[in-house]
Amino acid sequence: MGSELETAMETLINVFHAHSGKEGDKYKLSKKELKELLQTELSGFLDAQKDVDAVDKVMKELDENGDGEVDFQEYVVLVAALTVACNNFFWENS
């Protein structure tokens, strides 16, 4: 069994690949796949967004190369940004 951090890294990888490749490239998330991932894995994040275009905005911000898909590196940027925001929130409110 690995450390907590190794387990967390494995989970990030597994979550990405559980949702990627259903439509085309197995190493990227389409907009539909990204929406499914967000709804399944980050439903609290989506629920907090009152914007019906939240997924479109997230996709636009993440898709750095403009190919209309989110690769693993772009996905990790989302996870890192949300982790920083959560860390800041919890430290400020503790």
From Swiss-Prot:
PANTHER family noted in UniProt: PROTEIN S100-A1-RELATED, S100 CALCIUM-BINDING PROTEIN
Main location group: cytoplasm
Gene3D superfamilies xrefs: EF-hand (1.10.238.10)
GO biological process, one term: vasodilation
GO molecular-function terms, A-Z: ATPase binding; calcium ion binding; calcium-dependent protein binding; identical protein binding; protein homodimerization activity; S100 protein binding
Keyword Ribosomal protein: no
Expressed in which tissues: Highly prevalent in heart. Also found in lesser quantities in skeletal muscle and brain.
Name of the protein described by the UniProt record: Protein S100-A1
Gene Ontology CC terms, in alphabetical order: cytoplasm; cytosol; extracellular region; Golgi apparatus; M band; mitochondrion; nucleoplasm; nucleus
Keywords: Calcium, Cytoplasm, Glutathionylation, Metal-binding, Mitochondrion, Repeat, S-nitrosylation, Sarcoplasmic reticulum
This protein's record includes keyword Cytoplasm: yes
Assembly information from the UniProt record: Dimer of either two alpha chains, or two beta chains, or one alpha and one beta chain. Also forms heterodimers with S100P. Interacts with AGER. Interacts with CAPZA1. Interacts with FKBP4. Interacts with RYR1 and RYR2. Interacts with CACYBP in a calcium-dependent manner. Interacts with PPP5C (via TPR repeats); the interaction is calcium-dependent and modulates PPP5C activity. Interacts with ATP2A2 and PLN in a Ca(2+)-dependent manner. Interacts with mitochondrial F1-ATPase subunits ATP5F1A and ATP5F1B; these interactions increase F1-ATPase activity.
Entry-annotated residues carrying S-nitrosocysteine: C86
CDD domains listed in its UniProt record: S-100A1
Subcellular location(s) of the protein: Cytoplasm; Sarcoplasmic reticulum; Mitochondrion
Pfam families: EF-hand_1, S_100
List of residues binding Ca(2+) 2: D63, N65, D67, E69, E74
Main function: Small calcium binding protein that plays important roles in several biological processes such as Ca(2+) homeostasis, chondrocyte biology and cardiomyocyte regulation. In response to an increase in intracellular Ca(2+) levels, binds calcium which triggers conformational changes. These changes allow interactions with specific target proteins and modulate their activity.
All residue ranges annotated as the EF-hand domain in the record: 13-48, 50-85
Modification after translation, per record: Glutathionylated; glutathionylation increases affinity to calcium about 10-fold.
InterPro entries the UniProt entry points to: EF-hand-dom_pair, EF_Hand_1_Ca_BS, EF_hand_dom, S100-A1, S100/CaBP7/8-like_CS, S100_Ca-bd_sub
